[in-house]
Design a protein with these regions (language model features):
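Glycine-rich phosphate-binding loop of actin/hexokinase-like ATP-binding domains
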Residues: 124, 128-198, 277-301
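Glycine-rich phosphate-binding loop plus the immediately following alpha-helix
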Residues: 38, 112-114, 158-233, 299-320
């Protein structure tokens, strides 16, 4: 019932290392098939289940099944890139079902890629030239953080589960226009009011006149405060962390999540981080917010770069031609 409420555009079924546990993925697939959703299904689990999946989602009955290599083929090994590519292919083939998109397909001869996916493609290309990096895209509705980096040897010894080399997180509550009230709530209304007062303007007045593209000095200052919160929160959520665990032999340290300590470059793209006056200082906050020392965030050595021409998403699409 919950799946029908969500009305997903695509379902990914995974689970079970190759030649390991089979039953859970099969049971989930049968339940999904019984819902008669008529949407693409991607299977990226135990290789032994592939034939079973073809029987559950028969092509001759109009089912759209994509079978891809296991995302978790063996313990402590991730293999996400083949699955990522197939999801992109499924998106392209089915995007024309969205209102108005059939006309876009008629005009476009190349690939159609959602903006976060396009920015990730560009980020992976930049990695080949620059090395370890993260890219931040603060928009009106979301804040996306893309990282392509390998964990340090020190952190690798502490990791309790693997992380992909290329990772993207999309924070749906950290947009600086559509979701501005959620960012205000994240900062704290009283704290934000005081920050605005220190900069010589009224928070209430700035929010009353607030628009998608700031025009006045007050609006620009307010957007910068919201953007700083979005950037820091997105980085904290994306980054892994160290954690203490206690056992018979005493306390030990483990690492969970994505290690960003090797990142050499922090890149800003999107409307806010390509246009705001203090965009570089805002991004620099990522390297200063790790007060506990337990977050695996970039250090002060990281350099700040800005996509001044706002072309990373376009370059990501062009790279797929």
């Amino acid at each position: 019932a919950k799946i029908k409420e969500i009305r997903p555009n695509l379902i990914l079924i995974a689970g079970g290392v190759d030649y390991g546990e089979r039953d859970t993925a099969i049971a989930n697939a049968e339940m999904i098939r019984s819902m008669n959703l008529k949407i693409p299904v991607v299977y990226a689990g135990n290789v032994e289940n592939q034939e079973e999946m073809r029987l559950i989602f028969p092509e001759e009955e109009g089912e759209q099944l994509y079978i891809v290599e296991n995302v978790y083929p063996k313990i402590d090994a991730l293999n996400v890139e083949p699955c990522r590519k197939v999801i992109q292919d499924a998106f392209e083939q089915n995007i024309t079902h969205a209102p108005g998109m059939e006309h876009v397909r008629e005009m476009v001869t190349g690939p159609i890629i959602p903006t976060p996916g396009a920015v990730m493609e560009c980020t992976k290309l930049l990695y080949e030239y620059l090395g370890d990096l993260i890219v931040l895209d603060v928009g009106g509705a979301t804040t996306d953080l893309h990282s392509v980096t390998v964990e340090s040897d020190q952190v690798a010894r502490l990791m309790i589960s693997p992380e992909p080399k290329a990772k993207r997180t999309v924070e749906g509550d950290l947009g600086v226009y559509v979701n501005r009230w959620k960012v205000v709530e994240s900062i704290g209304e009283e704290k934000l009011r005081e920050q605005c007062r220190e900069q010589g303007f009224s928070m209430e007045h700035a929010l009353e006149t607030y628009r998608a593209i700031p025009k006045t000095e007050e609006e620009v200052k307010l957007v910068e405060l919201l953007t700083r919160e979005a950037v820091v929160k997105a980085a904290e959520r994306h980054a892994g962390r160290l954690r203490y665990i206690y056992g018979p032999s005493g306390r030990s340290t483990v690492a969970e999540g994505k290690d960003l300590t090797q990142v050499k470059y922090i890149v800003g793209t999107g409307g806010a981080l390509t246009r705001l006056p203090h965009r570089e200082e805002i991004m620099r906050e990522i390297t200063r917010c790790n007060e506990s020392g337990m977050l695996l965030l970039p250090g002060e050595h990281a350099q700040i770069l800005v996509d001044h021409d706002y072309i990373m998403a376009s370059l990501g699409v062009l790279s797929k031609r």
